[in-house]
């Protein structure tokens, strides 16, 4: 059975995880048959080992790990591969596939560029920056 493990950095503020939880929830709606876990490198729980163990416990024999990072930072290049190797050693009958950072995917780059343009073209700016009482709409492209 296939499983999906989303792996994010983690933060002290619990609200930081909101977008990642929303992604996991959206994926579960789109693929209700797919066991999905969300794990964090640091500062939040569950960690990668715990989340992978939960997927294995429900019968997953193939687990795809998607680093939810914008780029291949030091964490993705330096910290994640040894963690995945430890999963492989702990669960030798499970195939763990580590993908590239999600932010390096062309579809994510296009989506973020589009969202950025949506943000900057929907803002009303003052016609005269020294007199903010005179707003003007930016042209839509």
Predicted segments, located by residue:
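Active-site-proximal alpha-helix that buttresses catalytic centers in soluble enzyme cores
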Residues: 1-141
């Amino acid at each position: 059975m296939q499983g999906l493990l989303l792996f994010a950095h983690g933060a002290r503020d619990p609200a930081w995880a909101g977008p990642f939880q929303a992604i996991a929830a959206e994926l579960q709606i789109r693929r209700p048959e797919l066991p999905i876990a969300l794990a964090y490198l640091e500062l939040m729980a569950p960690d990668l080992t715990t989340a992978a163990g939960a997927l294995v416990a429900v019968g997953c024999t193939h687990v795809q790990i998607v680093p939810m990072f914008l780029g291949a930072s030091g964490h993705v290049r330096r910290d994640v591969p040894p963690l995945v190797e430890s999963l492989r050693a702990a669960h030798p009958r499970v195939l763990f596939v580590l993908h590239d950072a999600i932010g390096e995917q062309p579809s994510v780059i296009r989506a973020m560029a589009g969202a950025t343009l949506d943000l900057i073209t929907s803002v009303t700016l003052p016609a005269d920056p020294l007199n903010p009482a005179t707003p003007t709409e930016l042209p839509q492209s």
